[in-house]
Curated annotation (Swiss-Prot):
Keyword Nucleus tagged: no
HTH marR-type domain ranges (all copies): 1-137
Alphabetized UniProt keyword annotations: DNA-binding, Transcription, Transcription regulation
The protein's name: Uncharacterized HTH-type transcriptional regulator BC_1936
GO molecular-function terms, A-Z: DNA binding; DNA-binding transcription factor activity
DNA-binding region as annotated in the record: 53-76
Organism the protein comes from: Bacillus cereus (strain ATCC 14579 / DSM 31 / CCUG 7414 / JCM 2152 / NBRC 15305 / NCIMB 9373 / NCTC 2599 / NRRL B-3711)
Pfam families according to UniProt: MarR (PF01047)
CDD domains named among the record's database cross-references: HTH_ARSR
Biological processes, Gene Ontology terms: regulation of DNA-templated transcription; response to stress
Amino acid sequence: MRDNTIGSLIWLRLIRFTNQSNQLSNEFLKRFDLTTAQFDVLLQIRTYQPLTQMELAEKVTVTQGGISRMLTRLEKEGYIVRKQDWKTKTISLTEQGEAALERALPEQLAFQSSFFDDVLNEEEQKILYELMTKVHKHSEKKELPQE
């Protein structure tokens, strides 16, 4: 680890935290018959509906191919409806999808929050949020170094 920079150590820690929290969230959401990715997709649809598949793909951490398969499954389960409006196909939640999200949402938000509430006070959480927001915004503009 001597060759690592503090930046590379932070990056590794973030990756490990993300993987661990996703595994635990997937296990937690099984009680609602959802995965973390499905939960995120349903939440984004509810927040921005109606929206196109392209708009949805920009908001979630699923690949374009993965989002197609997931939407097909969510549609078969009756959670979403895809509607063709002239040239555009939009996605919205059904009543069943809304109900599934409402069952899972309070408990999943509490579970997600517990990762931080258990070890950080409110001021530390605010600082972490501000720092992560700053890093995230920078990463959205980041370009690859020249070869």
